[in-house]
Amino acid sequence: MKIALDPFMIRHVPLLELPSVVAELGYEWIELSPREDFIPFFRHPRVDDGTVAKFRKALDSAGVGISSLLPLFRWSGPDEDARQAAVRYWTRSIQIAADLGVTSMISEFNGRPEEPDRSEAQFWKSMDELLPLFEREGITLTLEPHPDDFIENGYDAINLIRGINHPNVSFLYCAPHTFHIGDDAPGIIEYAGDLLTHVHLADAFDHTASSGNRYILNPPGTPARIHQHLDIGEGEVDFGELFGALRANGFDGTLTACVFAWEERAKESSLFMRKKIDEYLTDRS
């Protein structure tokens, strides 16, 4: 099992210094989410081959690996120009992963919930173009349902991934999305079975609680989604239940601490999350 850190809260650390900083926080693995000087959100990668080589050397020197790259592109459109651009961005990102020796990439479906049929059609078109590249480079792709996407429910995401019917494609369970994707960690984890290879760990409040008034959004009836990525214990996700389900399912993949809420105390949060993950892994009660 790998325990990784998503270093988004410390993304302002220079890229070549990042591995040593992550090592100091007690992690041996980085799940590298978007950052402006590497692979930014929804735009073409900003890094050249020389910097990729230097980054790989810095990782080796620090004794830290990249568990996964996590790019986010609009490969499900629904706009066709956006989809084609996303495929170009993906192509370069896959090459970067290969040059780093990374064998895992993670992403979302990245379509629109108000256009689910069009988004899914665009997703399949992109998969037809990109799956051969993943195969050629020996890279796996792990997908997660996300709030405000054309697939938000965990069971629906698993069914779609099964429909892809490819050994390189698997499922990610994101704990801070629990209350958006079905609020059924044990059921979703069991249903995923061997398709579950990655888990994101952070806490969140149940936005459906208190008759939907845990949060009050304006204007009334807005379709906006709300969630958090908090330290474990600060929200309402049942982590005892979640880790119990992972044990029952024989999970042996990658656990990633992905707290985004506390940039002002990012070091303390990252250290705390590493400790809590170890506690849950050793607690068999």
Language-model segments: residues:
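Catalytic domains of carbohydrate-active enzymes, especially glycoside hydrolases
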Residues: 18-36, 101
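Glycine-rich, proline-tolerant flexible connector loops at the mouths of alpha/beta enzymes
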Residues: 31-59, 110-115
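A short, acidic, flexible beta-alpha connecting loop/helix-capping segment that sits on the rim
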Residues: 254-269
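Conserved, mostly hydrophobic/aromatic
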Residues: 5, 22, 30, 59, ...
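C-terminal helical cap(s) of enzyme catalytic domains, especially alpha/beta-barrels
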Residues: 266-285
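Short, acidic/polar
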Residues: 12-22, 84-95, 181-189, 239
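Active-site acidic/histidine proton-transfer and metal-coordination neighborhood
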Residues: 16-17, 58-62, 75-173
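Acidic/histidine-rich catalytic cores of soluble enzymes
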Residues: 2-5, 29, 66-69, 128-236, ...
